[in-house]
Amino acid sequence: LDAGSEAIIVKTDVSKKDSINEMVEKAIQTFGKIDILINNAGIRHVKKLLDHTKQDWDDMISVNLTAPFLASQAVIPHMIKNGKGKIINFGSIASFMGRPDRVGYVAAKSGVLGLTRALSVDLTGKNINVNTICPGLISTPFNQKYAEDPKHGEAWGKETVVGRWGQPKDIVGAAVFLSSDESDFINGSEIKIDGGWLSSKVRKGELDNE
């Protein structure tokens, strides 16, 4: 915005197709085209497996998986008309592993990887790239209660190779890159931004410098 760009806010219920379509049409009316779509809405219920209701499950799938599909479906015709486009879905480290008390979230975020791959194939020849960013422990309002938890917060951060929780700024570079022409040969892929958390489960005393 400091560079003179224009932004609008469109209140949208991403669980509803009509609301998503209205958001897209408002963007087209305002800017004339859509070059980039970032599917980053997300919710998470943390409950024991047997306490996880069907409504909890439906909520997880609707917002975390169905919404990226519907938004992509709404935007893709405009990108085809433009002759190019970039779609960035947001997965999670939960896309690659089970996590306790998060059955719906893990299932939905795993599905995002499949959605990304399928979309990239279906859009062959359309000059539209579809990729996924998979954040790890990022200190945002979404994870605030875990990051600030005196028992687990600092300990979880130290389990990353980098040795800390990530910050929102750690995500920005990947999003900008995947939105740019420099990523034109990357399609149907995912970038993990987790401080090495998935690569090596470091425990205190295991490193040579400790």
Q: In which residue ranges do the predicted regions lie?
A:
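Short C-terminal tail/terminal secondary-structure segment
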Residues: 97, 176, 187-210
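Short-chain dehydrogenase/reductase
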Residues: 1-31, 45, 55-56
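Active-site loop-to-helix junction immediately N-terminal to the catalytic Tyr of the SDR YXXXK motif
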Residues: 47, 52, 98-107, 118
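Active-site helix of classical SDR
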Residues: 72, 108, 116
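Alpha-helical segment proximal to the catalytic Tyr-Lys
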Residues: 77, 121-125, 184
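Substrate-binding pocket helix/loop in short-chain dehydrogenase/reductase
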Residues: 48-49, 56-61, 156
